[in-house]
């Protein structure tokens, strides 16, 4: 009988130990990897050393992202041990005075009053009846709707569902014995484990700074990655990787939480990130461990390229709408857009630093003035740009180049529908006078979109058919001079 009671007692002790929740926090980490995607998505791989019981374990994995998607969480053993996950709960209801009060409704608390004259503290017990817009307390002889001033509440404990930080609570079954050995019921051992999950609250974007040379024929280009962490936890000593490209997701993206980053950290520009292809995307890896604190924005160097050859273009683009009707004057002092263009490739025999895939982002361009001070001259957004592709940046509008455009003739030669559309044959003519106030000659690219089937009948300068629906002229305008471009076109709608 005594032996039976002793066995039952030992079994009860073992069960209590197994049921006891064991916490694990960031101090247990042996490795941390974070891969951030476009579109408020990241993959976190958190490796830790955890003390594990033989049999059922109750583990509180603390310091996870508050924006984690718990359905994506995956726990695995790094030591090859058998591990069976039975249950998991994502506890993101964080401990605050108000939450503690709300969870204590119906419970007994101790109310402590301070006597301002005597300085003596007096306490009595009360039951929390409500915690909405204040607190309602029921004492043995009365009900009060607020705390005494000065006064405070002492709670009996913290409810199990309230955490001081985001926590993934897990129940799993483990076998801690070496292969081929029997395991005592109360055996414990340290085991390497990795928790991986997808989360929001981690974003990245690329930004580029280009300095245009004095001759305006080359740029020095530096790329930066701006990382923002609003996920509710910090990632210290993390291996950081970035995915550029559009990853398909079956659920709509959640909007980023309305939080402002508290700090801005700038990293050294000397070590660009390493790039490689991954499936149909591109992966960028930081070659050192980094810290990304909660509510922090950090910048790290992406690339650095020197003396990248560029071409400047003045481009005046019209519209296809005025080819179908009679309009006369089409604009005075029209200003060409200024573009800067370069090819994402390394020149033969030159190590410019280009020739790698460029993530989408904003390129900001600067040029030094006569005193050597860099001045901002424009910016434009680029899409993901593969190796060998052309980057074209619109920087603004030309100040010293203007143009006047007018329609000089319009004839309906045939009508097969109401007015000119949806059917008809039209002949129309135009005049474009381009003036150059600069002290050097310029070449202006004139682009005229023309809908329908068209035929150029007359023109003062030869055009190129850039596409089926556009005519393009390259017009050289002398310094402080002007040139008039005329053309007549027949259009069938």
Residue ranges and their predicted role:
Residues 13-15:
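N-terminal signal peptide c-region/cleavage motif recognized by signal peptidases
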Residues 2-8, 17-493:
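Long, intrinsically disordered, low-complexity accessory segments associated with secretion
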């Amino acid at each position: 009988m005594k032996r039976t009671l002793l066995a039952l007692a030992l079994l009860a002790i073992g069960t209590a130990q197994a049921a006891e929740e064991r916490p694990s926090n960031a101090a247990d980490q042996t490795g941390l990897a974070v891969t951030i995607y476009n579109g408020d998505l990241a993959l976190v791989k958190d490796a830790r050393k955890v003390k594990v019981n033989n049999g059922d374990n109750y583990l509180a994995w603390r310091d996870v992202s508050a924006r984690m998607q718990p359905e994506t969480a995956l726990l695995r053993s790094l030591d090859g041990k058998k591990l069976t996950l039975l249950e998991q709960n994502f506890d993101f209801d964080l401990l605050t005075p108000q939450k503690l009060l709300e969870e204590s409704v119906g419970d007994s608390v101790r109310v402590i009053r301070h006597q301002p004259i005597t300085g003596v503290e007096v306490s009595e017990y009360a039951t929390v009846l409500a915690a909405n817009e204040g607190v309602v307390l029921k004492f043995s002889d009365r009900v009060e709707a607020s705390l005494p001033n000065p006064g405070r509440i002492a709670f009996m404990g913290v409810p199990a569902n309230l955490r001081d930080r985001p926590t993934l609570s897990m129940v799993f079954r483990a076998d801690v014995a070496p292969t081929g050995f029997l395991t005592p019921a109360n055996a414990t051992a340290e085991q390497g484990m990795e928790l991986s999950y997808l989360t929001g609250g981690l974003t990245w974007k690329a930004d580029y700074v280009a300095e245009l040379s004095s001759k305006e024929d080359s740029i020095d280009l530096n790329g930066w990655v701006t990382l923002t962490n609003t996920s509710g936890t910090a990632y210290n000593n993390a291996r950081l990787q970035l995915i550029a490209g559009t990853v398909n997701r079956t659920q709509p993206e959640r909007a980023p939480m309305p939080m402002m980053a508290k700090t801005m950290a700038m990293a050294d520009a000397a070590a660009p990130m390493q790039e490689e292809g991954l499936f149909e995307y591109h992966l960028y890896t930081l070659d050192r461990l980094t810290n990304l604190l909660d509510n922090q924005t950090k910048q790290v160097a992406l690339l650095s390229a020197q003396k990248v050859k560029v071409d400047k273009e003045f481009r005046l683009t019209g519209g296809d709408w005025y080819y179908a009707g009679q309009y006369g004057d089409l604009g005075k002092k029209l200003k060409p857009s200024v573009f800067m263009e370069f090819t994402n490739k390394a020149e033969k025999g030159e190590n410019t630093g280009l020739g790698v895939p460029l993530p989408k982002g904003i390129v900001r361009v600067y040029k030094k003035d006569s005193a050597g001070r860099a001045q901002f001259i424009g910016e434009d957004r680029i899409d993901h740009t593969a190796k060998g592709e052309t980057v074209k940046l619109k920087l603004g509008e030309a100040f010293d180049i203007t143009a006047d455009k007018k329609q000089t003739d319009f004839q309906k030669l045939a009508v097969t529908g109401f007015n000119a559309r949806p059917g008809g044959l039209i002949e129309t003519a135009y005049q474009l006078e381009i003036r150059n106030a600069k002290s050097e000659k310029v070449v202006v690219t004139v682009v005229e979109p023309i809908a329908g089937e068209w035929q150029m009948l007359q023109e003062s300068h030869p055009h190129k058919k850039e596409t089926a629906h556009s005519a393009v002229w390259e017009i050289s305008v002398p310094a402080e001079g002007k040139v008039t471009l005329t053309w007549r076109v027949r259009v069938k709608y």
